[in-house]
Curated annotation (Swiss-Prot):
Compartments, record wording: Cytoplasm
Chain intervals for the UniProt region annotation (Disordered): 1-21
Gene Ontology annotations for the cellular component aspect, listed alphabetically: cytoplasm; membrane
UniProt GO molecular function: dolichyl-phosphate beta-D-mannosyltransferase activity
Main function: Transfers mannose from GDP-mannose to lipid acceptors to form polyprenol monophosphomannose (PPM); catalytic activity in vitro is enhanced by Lnt (AC A0QZ13). PMM is an alkai-stable sugar donor which adds mannose-phosphate residues to triacylated-PIM2, eventually leading to generation of the cell wall glycolipid lipoglycan modulins lipoarabinomannan (LAM) and lipomannan (LM).
Pfam families: Glycos_transf_2 (PF00535)
Other comment: In a number of other Mycobacteria, including M.bovis and M.tuberculosis, this protein is the first domain in a 2 domain protein.
The organism of origin for this protein: Mycolicibacterium smegmatis (strain ATCC 700084 / mc(2)155) (Mycobacterium smegmatis)
Family: Belongs to the glycosyltransferase 2 family.
Record note on disruption phenotype: Essential it cannot be deleted. In depletion experiments increasing amounts of phosphatidyl-myo-inositol (PI) and decreasing amounts of acylated PI mannosides (AcPIM), as well as decreased synthesis of lipomannan (LM) but not lipoarabinomannan (LAM) are observed.
Record field: catalytic activity: a di-trans,poly-cis-dolichyl phosphate + GDP-alpha-D-mannose = a di-trans,poly-cis-dolichyl beta-D-mannosyl phosphate + GDP
Protein name, UniProt field: Polyprenol monophosphomannose synthase
CDD domains: DPM1_like (cd06442)
Length: 265
């Protein structure tokens, strides 16, 4: 029986040299992404044919879930679908995907947007960083070599302000802590108490990064090009921003108190 996501090994291959990223699951949450989903799935497998994909659909009324089923039927070994009955937020979708992937033995779990803003052609950069020893590889817009395309200046200012705000309050050195294109070793997700993570929106990324750092895992930023979606509608909302502001402030205060008491979360 083959291990999920693992390429066939030659008879003379030393198991000690098998890379963790040979067992990779790319998790793609969807809500009304019917136009984008076939394109992104095709691009992922063109760039990295060995990886598996899990589409986590939150009951999209536009038929995204049914389309995902068609893609899985056409490629049952590499494409899988999880159907959820309601839109419970980005964080909840990823947590469900992590649980699914960990229970099936994947060694590396990747977060990727369905709208094309995270280029599948750059996925190998994240996987190479994990193979080189990173516990969490973040696709960063704000390190040398990283860039953003086609964003309104207000979105860019908001993003950079959120990252500066988070770095200051949490005391971490990550330039793009809000980034949603990232690859985790399974050990990170197993060590973090995922049942305690209740972030629903985009601050989910800040939450998990902060927890990974506090648990002693290595975090590496890899430059990527982030491109604003061309099809569909952005899911960013005022409630996402408010959640991030209040939670980051809470975590920052709690983190200082925890460090004073020697507590690790």
């Amino acid at each position: 029986m083959s291990v999920p996501g693992e390429r066939e090994q030659g008879a003379g291959e030393d198991p000690a040299t098998v890379r963790p990223t040979q067992r990779t699951l790319v998790i793609i949450p969807t809500y009304n992404e019917r136009e984008n989903l076939p394109l992104i799935v095709g691009r992922v497998h063109h760039a990295c044919p060995q990886v598996h994909i899990l589409v986590v659909d939150d009951g999209s009324p536009d038929g995204t879930g049914a389309l995902a089923d068609e893609l899985a039927l056409a490629d049952p070994d590499r494409v899988h679908v999880m159907h959820r009955t309601s839109k419970a937020g980005l964080g909840a979708a990823y947590l469900a995907g992590f649980d699914w992937g960990l229970r099936r033995g994947y060694s590396v779990l990747v977060e990727m947007d369905a709208d094309g803003s995270h280029a599948p052609e750059e996925l190998s950069r994240l996987l190479d960083a994990v193979d080189a020893g990173a516990d969490l590889a973040i696709g960063s817009r704000y390190v040398p070599g990283g860039t953003v395309r086609n964003w309104p200046w207000r979105r860019l200012v908001l993003s950079k302000t959120a990252n500066t705000y988070s770095r200051f309050l949490l005391g971490v050195g990550i330039h793009d802590i809000t980034a949603g294109y990232r690859a985790y070793r399974r050990e990170v997700l197993e060590k973090i108490d995922l049942s305690a993570v209740d972030s629903k929106g985009y601050c989910f990324q800040i939450d998990l990064t902060w927890r990974a750092i506090n648990n002693g895992f290595s975090v590496v930023e890899v430059p990527i090009t982030f491109t604003e979606r061309e099809l569909g509608v952005s899911k960013m909302s005022g409630s996402n921003i408010r959640e991030a502001m209040f939670k980051v402030a809470e975590w920052g205060i709690r983190g200082r108190l925890d460090r004073a008491r020697g507590v690790v979360r």
